[in-house]
Amino acid sequence: NDYDLRRTIRGLVLSDAYARDSQWPEGERPSPVYFAVARPRPLTPNQYGSALVFAAADPEQLAKPKTPEDLAKRLADLEKRGENLAKRFDRPDDTFQVSVDEALYFSNSDQVQNDLLGEGGKLLGRVLKTEGLAKRLEVAFLNTLSREPSPEETETLNHYLAARNEDEKGAWQQVLWALMTSSEMRFNR
């Protein structure tokens, strides 16, 4: 095929194997010996630290770099901050469970409040500047989980935010905290 990568990639992407899902949709899961579905794995400390820092970043700061060098510098800075955050997390093993220390750190740490849930130059600031609740939820979900919210999630969060409209910033901090500490964020699927 004269090393036609476009043709090869197209063949892979359109294959039945590529179209399969790695999560079991319903019913009883098959035995692990069949390798029918992927096992969720916890992210390594560096992966999780970087994922949190990238999720907390203002998406507009990454969307419009002045030069490629500016973007590379910004990404390197975010990765370095992720490495610093990673020191707080346990290295996962086969029997990994989120530690009590990690849960308490996310619940009580000033670093989490300032670095991940702060307003200036962060996702929270961008969400609060965005017009319309649906668009705000979309920005929050795309930045943290790389997907749009489901209709059920949208309905639940609409009720949650409506009940806390007197402290909009605090309510959105809680929403972002919940997304960043969710199992969907912590585990590789």
Say what each PLM segment does:
Residues 6-7, 14-150, 174, 179-189:
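An acidic, gly/pro-interrupted, aromatic-rich
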Residues 1, 155-165:
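Amphipathic alpha-helical segments that form the core helices of the histone-fold
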